[in-house]
Amino acid sequence: MPKFNKKLIYKIPIYLIFLIFVFTLFELISFDNKYINKKSITFDVDNVRNPQIKKLVRTIDNLSGNIYFSLSEKKKKEFFQIDKNKYNNLPEEILIKAKEKNLTISNKKNKENSKNWQRSHGNQSSNKFSSLKQINSENVDLLDVAWTYKFSKKGVVPGNAIFFEDKIYVSTPGKSLIALSAEKGEKIWERPTEGKAAVRGLMIHENKNIYFCDQKNLNSINSVSGEFNLNFGKKGKIKLKHKCQTTPVIIDKDIIIATFEPGIEVYDLSSGKIKWKFYLKKITKDFFRYGGKRFDYSGGNPWGGISADVDRKIVYISTGNAGRFYEGTSRPGKNKYSNSVIALDISSRKVLWEFQEVEHDIWNYDIASPPILTSIVRNGKEIDVVVAPTKFGNTLVLDRLSGKSLFDYKKIKVPLSDVPGEKTAFYQKKFLLPEAFSKQYFEKEDITDLSPESTKYVKEKIKDASYGFFTPNSVDKKNIVFKGGAQWMGASIDNTTSTMYVNSSDMPTFLWLEKVDKKNSYYRYSSNFEIIKDQYGYPGSKPPWGNLTSINLTNGKINWTVPFGEYEELTKKKYYDNRNS
């Protein structure tokens, strides 16, 4: 019988541990030398691809962080202490005056509206407005259905279709892109994709190639044949490291996309070769670890979309909220680049400016649609601007090159959070103009008046809740906000009149936190929300719950507002009074 080498047997566990260590180290490392504002080699738990390894690393990371936090009085003080003296000595409000000098004189490129629709959102300015006059207010009621095309699968298609050379191109609820005859609605071709195609949109270039993301890839397809453009990337595809679902833009020979890194990536339009990337986060050494936890750099994704000033070679980006929706204990500070409109100069590869609407967002007030490039008149001169309707009901009107607001706004001192470790911003912006197109914060007067019974029911339901202008969320106590404003559909702007049209919703919603009892969890609190409804299932605030609003962007005044959407049974009972129309 052969003899076993006892020393070798004893070494096997050591070898296994070493192999696991090496494999884990390999998983933690990521190499990408195309970022111009980020290190080529990063060492982070978020780089880990293997789910079992990621779970192990997170557990070790959280455990070590908790031990470090429990032993460090300095870190405890840093986490829990808020400078209330500084807060109390601050003024209640600060007026920020509108920019009046050195405005961006218009290059007249946005004076007219598009007469075609070769990109979701209408064009690269994303103004979603057509100058075609064949269909108008005098004959729209005479329209009849010419044809209907039914998808093979059910689901939502958020990105609107595009039109080119008598064909309609649209993504399906499944994983494919189709071309239809505009005249008959017959399918010409269907191209399967790896992921869900063109979730937020697609575009077609003058080279007759269609460009879109399927979350996993950037694709180029010939619009005539439906075949992949084999000269682009690898057989018509570019494998992406990070998810992409928004519509690309094209500037000269570059095609530009926004990813969930979050980042901007620039590729050669012909070959698909990567040129450079820009990381849309501001990482500082001061915020590597906070409260024993790794600083939460997640979120802030540009999922709302991007637009392009082709002549000036500038990409404009709208971003989402940082980290988790309703709590920010692991991400102190303003969370730069989140809840913002950002201007990125493609020639210099630098950020020209960024304008943040909500600081340290814990209410889910991200900017959900792409910025719109248009112009308004100031002091008799036409000025190029960037416009962004938001979930908070604001309309940001910013100078195209400086990013400064063209309307006054106030910074209002807001309540501090009572959640341990939650350091909310001392101030939030309140825009005086343009006038808000949706309800911005809940008040008692907003309680439903559909019936005395409904009023009583909702009053009882919210009696212990908090509400107000940017009132922070609490643990086990509900906070009321209006969930709605402008969603991912965004707005339309008539460039010839500087008029914006936006649909919005006003849904009263409970937000609250619950303490996480799970040992070594990365998150201290879980985030929760619930739409407030009466006993019959209707929203708990006064109707209308949705509006269509027209706003004059030159003076910031609302032209008109009409209810948009209905419950048919309430309409029949004449519950709607159209008091806001």
Residue ranges and their predicted role:
Residues L19-I29:
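Hydrophobic alpha-helical membrane-insertion segments, chiefly the h-region
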Residues F31-K133, F426-F437, E445-T448, E453-V458:
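N-terminal pre-domain segments of enzymes
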Residues G122-Q124, S130-Y169, K187-T193, V475-K483:
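Asp/Glu-centered strand-loop micro-motifs enriched in Gly/Pro and often flanked by an aromatic residue
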